[in-house]
């Protein structure tokens, strides 16, 4: 047992155990991952992801890390956008490297089909199997709250980015108005676990996912953590009144 603890939903567990517990959750939800995101966001996650891809604006020849990229939902968006830019003005293929801790998620993504620009790697966000100054952009979507040591993952993101590289993190966050916060809390705790039980036959996994959102830092606190990891010009944009937020920073 280690001397440190980590959050697992509303529980505090030994930090050495969290990764295995989270892996177990995603082993169970991998085949229903898109349904899970639809439940967690009311289907709006597709619009949020489109907005992140537009903000990234992938270009030919860029190297992009899609950390916790799981089933490849974001990576496919990036590949298609980079290919369209390539058709307009030429240039080499983009490289999009999905890195995910969970092999079941990666297998689910491969089964759905990929794009020629996409590679798949099983790896830990806290210890990426990639060299220093490797990528032009690092994106993590709905993944960082599941990491045992968020600060370590942020430092790794900074390490693997080239000078001038971009960091983008899409994550569930804190609604900015009290009525919306109360409504989303009611939906999260009363509806999502029950529907998860009906749809995926796994109430506990969905209960964890809801609780993990509530334990995640608010927008400004998380922005400060990104700055502490060495990123500059850190900003955040709220989506759907703060139900989710996109944080951005630069490796300068």
UniProtKB/Swiss-Prot annotation:
Q: Name one GO molecular function term.
A: 2-methoxy-6-polyprenyl-1,4-benzoquinol methyltransferase activity
Looking up Pfam families in the UniProt record yields: Ubie_methyltran (PF01209)
Q: Which UniProt keywords apply?
A: Menaquinone biosynthesis, Methyltransferase, S-adenosyl-L-methionine, Transferase, Ubiquinone biosynthesis
| Domain of life, per lineage | Bacteria
**Which regions form coiled coils?**
none
Record field: transmembrane: none
Which sites bind S-adenosyl-L-methionine?
Answer: 71, 100, 124-125, 141
Q: Which GO terms describe its biological process?
A: aerobic respiration; menaquinone biosynthetic process; methylation
Pathway given in the UniProt record: Quinol/quinone metabolism; menaquinone biosynthesis; menaquinol from 1,4-dihydroxy-2-naphthoate: step 2/2; Cofactor biosynthesis; ubiquinone biosynthesis
Catalytic reaction(s) noted: a 2-demethylmenaquinol + S-adenosyl-L-methionine = a menaquinol + S-adenosyl-L-homocysteine + H(+); a 2-methoxy-6-(all-trans-polyprenyl)benzene-1,4-diol + S-adenosyl-L-methionine = a 5-methoxy-2-methyl-3-(all-trans-polyprenyl)benzene-1,4-diol + S-adenosyl-L-homocysteine + H(+)
EC identifiers of the protein: 2.1.1.163, 2.1.1.201
Q: Which residues form the signal peptide?
A: none
Query: Mind telling me which InterPro entries this protein's record contains?
Result: SAM-dependent_MTases_sf (IPR029063), UbiE/COQ5_MeTrFase (IPR004033), UbiE/COQ5_MeTrFase_CS (IPR023576)
CDD domains in the record, alphabetically? AdoMet_MTases
Q: Tell me which HAMAP family the record gives.
A: MenG_UbiE_methyltr
Task: State the similarity comment.
Answer: Belongs to the class I-like SAM-binding methyltransferase superfamily. MenG/UbiE family.
Functionally, this protein is described as follows: Methyltransferase required for the conversion of demethylmenaquinol (DMKH2) to menaquinol (MKH2) and the conversion of 2-polyprenyl-6-methoxy-1,4-benzoquinol (DDMQH2) to 2-polyprenyl-3-methyl-6-methoxy-1,4-benzoquinol (DMQH2).
The protein's name in its UniProt record? Ubiquinone/menaquinone biosynthesis C-methyltransferase UbiE
What gene, per UniProt, encodes this protein?
A: ubiE
